[in-house]
Amino acid sequence: MSIIIDALPSAYEYDGRVYDMQTDFKEWMKFELLLTDTDIPINDKSRRLLELVFPQIPPDENLWDFILWFYQCGKEGARASKKAKSQKQTAIYSFEYDDGYIYAAFREIYNINLITVPYLHWWEFKSMFRALHDCKIVDIMGYRSEEISRDTPEYHKKFLTEMKRVYALPKSLTEQQKLAELKKIRESLNL
């Protein structure tokens, strides 16, 4: 599926019936925040996630496969390289804690006011978010993700260590952990 060629999904079809769904980026930001909330029991979380996405919940046992697909913008998770798998995974952004930086980046680069924009599809938002460049949030995500190795020059180690401290997120889930949480919810409901 291509977001440029194909119509962006806005509903779920099951058993000949079309179920409208929330597709605006703000609702899916809420979805991600709820997904990463470790204080909510999984059954309560799954119900609340469904209620957030669907005004009327489809009775399909495969619904979570669709939700996972939609959350990933119609793409399967990229296969991580062996090197990436062996590296310690760190969350590099948080919609809750980086909201100001994300807002500023969209204003600066795309001239989009994320506060007042009436609607922006989740897939459009995520595409633009991934393509951000030359802005503070990209620098911050770079600091958070860059690994400090033995080969890193001492001056850069000190700088990176300080930037990691300054821009540290409270315990946040990585992208892989978010997908794993969604899969765990899906599996718990398919008992």
Regions found by a protein language model. Give the residues of each.
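Charged interaction scaffolds used for protein-protein
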Residues: 1-18, 26, 36, 47-191
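Short, surface-exposed, low-complexity cationic segments
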Residues: 25-42
